[in-house]
A protein has these predicted regions:
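Catalytic core of pol beta-like nucleotidyltransferases
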Residues: 2, 6-8, 17-47, 51-124, ...
């Protein structure tokens, strides 16, 4: 009798687990659909911010939960690869070479390649992002003037973890017709660890030596956490 009751209980448990597994798979599939929709909105310019793209995608699909920025970023990378094809890889390598030229010119300011050119996740409209560390931005502007076209400069302040962070942004066009944004932070911030708001890992980037080695050994390598 006890054995029969246990077999019945076991059957119910297995049925419940199977149903739970189906629900998890359904949720996972739906998260992928929302992430894909949000990534599509970002790629084709319908939205510029991840949060707004996710909210709009969830509303379109009639759901009340959102995927992570990381999930959207992975879908965005897939869309870029599907849409742009082999030319994307060649453009990435060219952008990394252009970045290296600027970084060598600005080597004394501790340049670090960051953003999508570092990650290897560029898409149409991506620019080169380089972080610099110095207390006198005008000095960097003077170094740049002979090699690039400076289109805009501005101071920006953002609040992170309750503290204001100020940086000087320089927008340029390189000799190779690539657009770049140079972010100048204070010298005391050099070496400070920063967390990526999209991928959730540490924003390590590449210095001059690391970028040179990358271009020799694996020029199209991606840096995406697994």
């Amino acid at each position: 009798m006890l054995k029969k009751q246990w077999n019945c209980t076991k059957s119910y448990l297995n049925a419940d687990l199977a149903l739970y597994g189906e629900e998890l798979n359904a949720d996972s599939d739906l998260r992928c659909k929302i992430a894909r929709e949000a990534a599509t909105l970002l790629y084709f310019g319908a939205e510029k911010e991840y949060k707004q793209a996710k909210l709009k995608a969830a509303n379109t699909l009639g759901v009340h939960f959102l995927p992570s920025n990381f999930e959207v970023a992975l879908e965005l990378d897939k869309i870029a690869e599907e849409t742009e094809g082999p030319a994307r890889k060649e453009r990435l390598i060219q952008m990394r070479k252009e970045a290296l030229k600027m970084m060598k010119k600005l080597k004394k300011y501790g340049p670090i390649l960051i953003g999508s050119v570092w990650r290897g996740t560029i898409r149409q409209g991506s620019d080169i992002d380089i972080a610099l560390y110095h207390d006198v931005p005008d000095e960097i502007l003077n170094v740049l003037k002979s090699d690039v076209k400076i289109s805009k400069t501005e101071w920006t302040t953002v609040t992170k973890r309750g503290k204001p962070e100020t940086s000087f942004h320089i927008y340029v066009e390189t000799a190779g017709k690539q657009m770049a944004e140079l972010v100048v932070r204070s010298s005391e911030e050099a070496g400070c660890k920063r967390k990526c708001e999209i991928f959730g890992d540490e924003l390590k980037g590449l210095n001059v030596q690391e970028l040179e080695r990358l271009l020799k050994e694996n020029p199209a390598q991606k840096f995406i956490p697994v």
